[in-house]
């Protein structure tokens, strides 16, 4: 199965991936499991364990593999000058020249997509998933797990939702609401776009998670019944005030 793990923030994505890695270190080491972390800058990754799984690092490994394979073919060509082997050598040479461009950003999206599709687990932020320069346009997943979904706006959530056959949303609309920079509204209106209506602003500011939670059947949602963040008396008070003592 192809699994997508996303959140609005990098730290949430990395916490999940780091937990998976620590629980399955041997499986990741022998490549029984594989993951790729999509991120614009490696410095945004919060856990050192996860930096080895960035798409750019996977690409560097792939280049070395292709280069070694090419040199093997080159050696074979010296002993076998058949037409078939010569054509194979020429195509391999073209492929090697293609992937050895100076900058990772110059690599065709088709190659990035090929690398991404070879992994079972992909981690990214909601907006990072929409980056057209990372070869994600055609990526599809069997399941998307979206953490901190209560903090994401409708556009942010729709990006991963539309990529997956099944979706698991994890969040709490009673906690932090979606974060939208107020300057965004001003910038949109300053760009000669029609003034934002109340409904437009509500779409950006109200949690899409809350909308879904209110409308889906009870059989499709559940609530955790255990917390570790606060003393029991405080937890009971919050449960009574915001969660109907559930």
Task: Describe these PLM feature segments.
Residues 127-146, 150-246:
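Conserved helicase motor core of SF1/SF2 NTP-dependent helicases
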Residues 2-140, 179-200:
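Conserved P-loop NTPase motor core of helicases/translocases
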């Amino acid at each position: 199965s192809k699994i997508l793990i996303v959140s609005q923030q990098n730290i949430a994505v990395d916490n999940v991936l780091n937990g998976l890695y620590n629980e399955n270190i041997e499986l990741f080491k022998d490549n029984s499991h594989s993951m790729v972390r999509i991120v614009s800058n490696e410095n945004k990754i919060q856990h050192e364990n996860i930096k080895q799984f960035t798409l750019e690092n996977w690409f560097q490994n792939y280049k070395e593999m292709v280069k070694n394979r090419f040199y093997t073919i080159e050696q074979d060509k010296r002993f076998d000058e058949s037409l078939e082997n010569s054509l194979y050598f020429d195509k391999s040479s073209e492929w090697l020249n293609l992937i050895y461009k100076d900058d990772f950003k110059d690599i065709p999206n088709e190659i990035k997509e090929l690398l991404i599709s070879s992994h079972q687990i992909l981690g990214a932020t909601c907006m990072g998933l929409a980056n057209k320069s990372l070869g994600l346009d055609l990526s599809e997943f069997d399941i998307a797990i979206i953490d901190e979904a209560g903090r994401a706006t409708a556009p942010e959530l729709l990006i991963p939702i539309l990529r997956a056959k099944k979706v698991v949303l994890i969040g709490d609309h009673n906690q932090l609401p979606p974060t939208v920079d107020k300057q965004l509204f001003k910038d949109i209106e300053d760009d000669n776009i029609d003034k934002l209506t109340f409904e437009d602003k509500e779409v950006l500011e109200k949690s899409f998670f809350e909308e879904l939670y209110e409308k889906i059947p009870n059989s499709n949602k559940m609530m955790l019944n255990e917390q570790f963040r606060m003393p029991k008396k405080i937890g009971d008070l919050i449960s009574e005030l915001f969660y109907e003592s559930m």
